Every structure is written in structure tokens, then in C-alpha cells.
Swiss-Prot record:
SUPFAM superfamilies: F1F0 ATP synthase subunit C. Keywords: ATP synthesis, Cell inner membrane, Cell membrane, CF(0), Hydrogen ion transport, Ion transport, Lipid-binding, Membrane, Sodium, Sodium transport, Transmembrane, Transmembrane helix, Transport. This is ATP synthase subunit c, sodium ion specific. The lineage of its organism: Bacteria, Fusobacteriati, Fusobacteriota, Fusobacteriia, Fusobacteriales. It is found in: Cell inner membrane. The chain crosses the membrane at residues 9-29, 68-88. It comes from Ilyobacter tartaricus. Its main location: membrane.
Length: 89
């Protein structure tokens, strides 16, 4: 296999993989919006529990955001520090 063709295939597959990884950012965004909306509803129903509701919401959003950050890191690695290009020689 021609080395230029192999490198092109690896870079194209990396771009597709990075795009697919960034699709994973949709889930945390939708989940965080839903959680924030439900927290607002909960505070409206029970204002005296505002502190507990907000702290639980922030903790849940931090956990949800971690998956989006991981997908961003994977996409950046695939695009700018691709370990597979070095294996070609």
C-alpha cells in the first residue's frame, strides 16, 4: 500500500472519528437543559428546598458534562495529536 494513501486513509478516518465523538456533546447539552428546567420547576413548587435542589442539580450537571469533555478531548487528540499517523513509519 502506498504510504501517502495509507496516511490519507488514517487522517480521513480520524476526521470521521472526531466528528462522531463530537456528536456525543449533544447528549450532555440536552440533559443539562432538562435538569435545569426540572430544577426551576422544583424550586417554584418548594422554595424552601432551594439550596438542596440547586446543589444536587449542579452536581448532576458536572457529572453529565464530563462525558462531553471526554468526547472533546478524544476529538482533539484524533485531529491534532493522532497516534496512528506515527505508526505508519
Amino acid at each position: 500500500m502506498d504510504m501517502l494513501f495509507a496516511k490519507t486513509v488514517v487522517l480521513a478516518a480520524s476526521a470521521v472519528g472526531a466528528g462522531t465523538a463530537m456528536i456525543a456533546g449533544i447528549g450532555p447539552g440536552v440533559g443539562q437543559g432538562y435538569a435545569a428546567g426540572k430544577a426551576v420547576e422544583s424550586v417554584a413548587r418548594q422554595p424552601e428546598a432551594k439550596g438542596d435542589i440547586i446543589s444536587t442539580m449542579v452536581l448532576g450537571q458536572a457529572v453529565a458534562e464530563s462525558t462531553g469533555i471526554y468526547s472533546l478531548v478524544i476529538a482533539l487528540i484524533l485531529l491534532y495529536a493522532n497516534p496512528f499517523v506515527g505508526l505508519l513509519g
